[in-house]
């Protein structure tokens, strides 16, 4: 029975020994401090990853926005060039029409000149 009492007392003595060796709970404070540093580091890494993701997304948005603006600008310039080409084509069509008028005018003028010469020859 005595050994039972001693056994029951030993853990208490261990607690007393631990309490005596660390009366201010420095070991627990160190563990808590290390855990706090770990949590801070973990939170910083989490914030860093989120910040990096946000920056990458913003960068993509800016790049796509800039690229879209450049593409839209190029499309606008291409449309302007196509409009100018259409205008030139209309001018060429007008020139072709004028050429047709000139060719028909020349043939009619030759006919008029021929008739006039015949008329003059008949008057002589």
From Swiss-Prot:
Location of the region described as Disordered in the Swiss-Prot/TrEMBL record: 1-20
Transmembrane segments: none
Keyword rRNA-binding: no
Highest taxon of the lineage: Eukaryota
Primary subcellular site in the record, as a coarse category: cytoplasm
Keywords of this entry: Coiled coil, Cytoplasm, Transport
Gene Ontology CC annotation, any one: BLOC-1 complex
GO biological process, one term: endosome organization
Cell location: Cytoplasm
Coiled-coil stretches noted in the UniProt entry, renumbered to this chain: 75-98
Functional description taken from the UniProt entry: Component of the biogenesis of lysosome-related organelles complex-1 (BLOC-1), a complex that is involved in endosomal cargo sorting.
Subunit structure: Component of the biogenesis of lysosome-related organelles complex-1 (BLOC-1).
Family: Belongs to the BLOC1S4 family.
UniProt-recorded name of the protein: Biogenesis of lysosome-related organelles complex 1 subunit CNL1
Source organism per UniProt: Kluyveromyces lactis (strain ATCC 8585 / CBS 2359 / DSM 70799 / NBRC 1267 / NRRL Y-1140 / WM37) (Yeast)
Native organism taxonomy: Eukaryota, Fungi, Dikarya, Ascomycota, Saccharomycotina
Gene: CLN1
């Amino acid at each position: 029975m005595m050994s039972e009492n001693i056994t029951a007392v030993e853990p208490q003595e261990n607690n007393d020994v631990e309490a005596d060796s660390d009366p201010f709970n420095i070991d627990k404070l160190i563990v808590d401090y290390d855990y706090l540093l770990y949590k801070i580091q973990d939170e910083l890494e989490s914030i860093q990853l989120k910040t990096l993701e946000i920056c990458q997304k913003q960068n993509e948005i800016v790049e796509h926005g800039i690229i879209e603006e450049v593409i839209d600008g190029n499309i606008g310039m291409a449309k302007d060039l196509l409009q100018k080409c259409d205008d030139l084509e209309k001018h060429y069509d007008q020139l072709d029409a004028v050429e047709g008028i000139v060719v028909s005018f020349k043939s009619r003028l030759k006919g008029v000149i021929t008739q006039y010469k015949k008329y003059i020859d008949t008057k002589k």
